[in-house]
A protein has these predicted regions:
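Non-transmembrane, aqueous-exposed alpha-helical and coiled segments at domain scale
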Residues: 1-427
Length: 427
């Protein structure tokens, strides 16, 4: 059985896209299992940058099967725009398969997302306003519309009519917002359904079949561990489960099929939006990290909050997803620092913290326990062998592995595919 998986260990933006692309080159099948178009990642191929939001990273290769699984929520308009944009850049989406069980983002989901966020004022959680949360809420409430419903007109009209009536009451009565139009939505989604029809299939069966045939299957995670609905810094989280268990349910295969689980660790820490961030640096260090790392959101363009690497977070992620290996990214961004700090523990009210706090008040009150390591103060972006890395760079990543208890698997020293150092077989 040849499977591999990529998980973000922090708050997202760890460089998962680059690691996924690196592994995808050797895969036969690439599977997206959760999330929606709220998370973007950039993949650089032949010095050309591709910004992907819904499409699996394997779409950039002609010989890969690409699957958008059951756990993904799909905005058909956005997906079709992404396919069109890809084709304009000389790539084809003919290898794409979309789960007939996946839930569909509707215009009223986006309207509700925007209205709800606006109503919160200073208490907003930083949603991307793409309708992801309201779509997942409908899924849980068992009133959602699935891809398969788009091809059963009677069912689709019935579900759409119910939802439009209910959602318009919420929009107009609760939020004093504009209602959505049933006829316009129906007409648009009939067109979307026809355009996507050739891609729709039973992806659960497709993934299982590929595994049984011993094909190399890569499970591609979106968002990251600290945004997990159950285990992240709730309520500043996403609406799905971007951990290994979420990939199992989202792709429709049992957990024993998930092997070679890589946890992607950015060599420093970033976060977009509100929520606790124990190692955040609201100073020159933070500004330098943001400038050197070009830390702005792929989808939103928002400046990311920056700070020192927090190994309490990474260690927590390692346990939640039973990580097999670490993939350290953006190590080159730290090239100019004379010294570096990593958080190896928290203190709360003067006492060492065991595990990871559930209470946001406790987490915000935690004081990071830092270790200081010497920097390497040299350009490592051209290095292609682990042994050629400066001694202090090796000590930095090896300390990460030591504290988290997870061995190193990949070290990235730049955005391009060839700026990657493999330490293990990825399948």
């Amino acid at each position: 059985m040849a499977t591999s998986m990529v998980i973000g260990t922090q708050w997202g933006d760890e460089g998962k896209g680059k690691i996924v692309d690196w592994i995808a080159e050797r895969a036969d099948v690439v599977v997206r299992s959760q999330g929606g178009n709220n998370a973007g990642h950039t993949v650089v191929v032949d010095d050309k940058a591709f910004a992907l939001r819904l499409l699996p990273s394997g779409i950039l290769y002609d010989d890969k099967q690409n699957i958008v699984g059951t756990g993904v929520v799909i905005d058909p308009k956005v997906l079709l725009q992404e396919i069109e944009g890809l084709e304009k850049q000389g790539k084809s989406a003919k290898s794409l398969h979309i789960s007939d069980r996946a839930h569909v983002i509707m215009p009223y989901h986006i309207a509700l997302d925007m209205a709800e966020e606006a109503s919160k004022g200073d208490a907003k959680i930083g949603t991307t306003k793409n309708g992801i949360g309201p779509c997942y809420a409908d899924k849980v409430n068992r009133i959602g519309i699935r891809i398969c419903d788009l091809y059963d007109m009677e069912t689709f009209k019935q579900k759409l009519a119910y939802n439009v009536e209910f959602k318009n009451k919420m929009l107009t009565k609760v939020y004093d917002a504009e209602p959505v139009n049933y006829d316009e939505i129906l007409a648009d989604y009939i067109k979307y359904a026809e355009a996507l029809k050739s891609y729709v299939t039973d992806t659960n069966n497709a993934v299982l079949k590929a595994i049984k045939e011993d094909k190399k299957v890569l499970f591609e995670g979106a968002q990251a561990t600290m945004l997990d609905l159950d285990h992240g810094t709730y309520p500043f989280v996403t609406s799905s489960h971007p951990i290994a268990g979420g990939a199992s349910t989202g792709a429709g295969v049992g957990p024993n099929y998930l092997k070679n689980i890589f946890g992607v660790v950015k060599a420093y820490a970033t976060r977009v939006g509100a929520g606790p961030f124990p190692t955040e640096q609201l100073n020159e260090i933070g500004e330098e990290l943001r400038t050197l790392g070009h830390e702005f959101g792929t989808v939103t363009g928002r400046p990311r909050r920056t700070g020192w690497l927090d190994l309490m977070v990474v260690k927590y992620a390692a346990g939640l997803s039973s990580l097999d290996y670490l993939a350290i990214t953006r190590l080159d961004i730290l090239d100019s620092f004379k010294e570096l700090k990593i958080c190896v523990g928290y203190k709360l009210n003067g006492k060492n913290v065991e595990g990871f706090p559930a209470s946001l008040n406790d987490l915000e009150a935690c004081e990071p326990v830092y270790e200081t390591l010497p920097g390497w103060e040299t350009d490592i972006s051209g290095i292609r062998s682990y042994d050629e890395l400066p001694e202090n760079a090796r000590k930095y990543v090896e300390r990460i592995a030591e504290v988290t208890g997870v061995p190193l698997g990949i070290v990235s020293v730049g955005p391009n595919r060839n700026q990657t150092i493999d330490l293990v077989n990825v399948f």
